[in-house]
Amino acid sequence: MNRQTSHPEQRLLLIRVSDGNYDENTKLVVTSFYPRRQEDANNNSTSPSSASSSGSEISTRLVNITPEDVVKFFDEHPTSSYIFTKGPEPIRHVLIPLFARNELCVPHPLHHYYDIKHLYYGNQEEDGMEQEEIEDDVAIARAILDMDDELLEKTHQFVNIEYQPAPILEDQEVGADGDNVVCRARGLPWQASDHHVAQFFAGLDIVPGGIALCLSSEGRRNGEVLVQFSSQESRDLALKRHRNFLLSRYIEVYKAGLDEFMHVATGSSTEAMEFVSANAIIVRMRGLPYDCTDAQIRTFFEPLKLTDKILFITRTDGRPTGDAFVQFETEEDAQQGLLKHRQVIGQRYIELFKSTAAEVQQVVKRCNLINSSPAVANAVEAPEEKKKDCVRLRGLPYEATVQHIVTFLGDFATMVKFQGVHMVYNNQGHPSGEAFIQMINEQAASACAAGVHNNFMSVGKKKRYIEVFQASAEELNLHHLVGQQHQVPPPAPLGFMGQLPPQAPQPQQFWSSYPSPPISPIVPGQVTQLIIYGIHMSIGVPELVANFTTPEHTVDNVLFTRWPTHLCPGEAILTLRNRGAPPPQTSPLSQISQLSAPNFAAYSHHPQNFPLQPILME
């Protein structure tokens, strides 16, 4: 290396790791040597063999892999140094992660280095050196001195220390390494952000916006992240950090495909793309009142200033989900804003989380696809107007069948739609004591509800009065949606149950989809469902029932959608029923105008043989 230097103390360093165990006994092997100086023009040129190459000018020492010892080593020679390695591991996998884990500034000499692995091994036959000499650090140092500047520039590597958030486009170009640039990490703490992930993979080149935190079906972080690197070399080094620790949790790292990353990190929403394109610091707000406004959010964060963009998350029908994303211009403002976690807007406490562009895309995409799920596609088609052409039966004996319901309805059974009786089962596959019946029109449903409400049904020796309410197809769709989300197969008709061996019930925990199912308003004579957030571990079903039971309303059912833990509060859905007086008893037939009898010829069988259409609910 005939490099003319301006400082006599400038040095070259050849760094490698003593072994591949990376434990407390692993050391850095550092070989220090100095470049040759050009002779004066009046002197004869010096050949490489006659240049100063004695062993006294090439020294090797061991350095402990601790921040203190490494910093001390570089401070001994404060001038700039050229670092050479045989592969990226000493810099990218050992030294830079060492400083990142301890939240220390990376020394400037480590920001770039010369990787001579491919160049040096590729020239081993040309140089005429044996394998034993290649492994000798002194021999490698002498070979480096013989390389010219142009050859060395080809080996120059720059380490990108800072991670750059950015939106990922669907038409993003794929690099030369193709699909071998993505890994999946599991086991992240719930409070981990994209910057924690970047710290875990410090020293490796991550593409701008290449960290995509994954969300569960509820829209919450599930402890997984997909990371896209700029090269396969960085991805392979990332796999070596399998079972390393992040925030006291060990992380599992596996290979993943580029299509998996693109599915999570990209989206088709123009509004979301415009929001994340600002490259500001994103914070997610959860638990907002449904009528929350832009001004209330800005007041909530005062005296901090937000950017002009606030993204409210809504369902496809325009109803808000209680989530929003805001942006801060600086990291300092974002950290101050996160200190307002669990403060209130109105009567609701607000949860705050640092977010990413990929998380914004996932939440918006999930809300846009919620109404295209198989559960909704299979639901009973609801008309544009909310016609109450259904009736809901409550208090049925568990042994009740469709035939018992038809007998209970009496003359009103002739006004039931074909295959219009829907039994409701819980998530263990047992009858819930409820049923939905589709009538031919609203007048028939109203007359049926008024005519048989609080009448008695006899099943064997049991005799119970049945509550009958007029309902809409939307309520039926809601229960059908909840039932489809369970993974429990529908039970067989009761006629076959006697032939099956008894099975012990297998309770399953119910997890609702994100966003939460819609809430019906409280209407006298009907039921409503309330979603309760922030439930403490000490709160159970008895406490919820006691708190929400009033002279006007009674709690019919409590469904925990998330059990409270010491890390995360719980959520539950409460079913309330109005205790208002039932409608006055009137003549059912007087409320029906010009109802024609159904055409039994159109049925393939007798209308009383309604096939069982089970749906599941909690």
Curated annotation (Swiss-Prot):
Keywords, alphabetical: mRNA processing, mRNA splicing, Nucleus, Repeat, RNA-binding
Keyword Repeat: yes
Protein name: RNA-binding protein sym-2
Localization per Swiss-Prot or TrEMBL: Nucleus
A GO biological-process term: RNA splicing
Main location group: nucleus
Protein's UniProt keywords contain Lyase: no
Region entry Disordered, spans: 33-59
Family stated for the protein in its record: Belongs to the ESRP family.
GO molecular function terms noted in the UniProt entry: mRNA binding; RNA binding
Compositional bias of kind Low complexity: 45-59
GO CC, any one term: nucleoplasm
InterPro entries the UniProt entry points to: ESRP, Nucleotide-bd_a/b_plait_sf, RBD_domain_sf, RRM_dom
Functional summary from the UniProt entry: mRNA splicing factor that regulates alternative splicing of many genes in embryo. Probably plays a role in the formation of embryo-specific isoforms.
Domain RRM: 281-357, 389-473
Phenotype upon loss of function: Worms lacking both symn-2 and mec-8 die during late embryogenesis. Lethality is probably due to defects in alternative splicing regulation.
Pfam short name (any one): RRM_1
Gene name per UniProt: sym-2
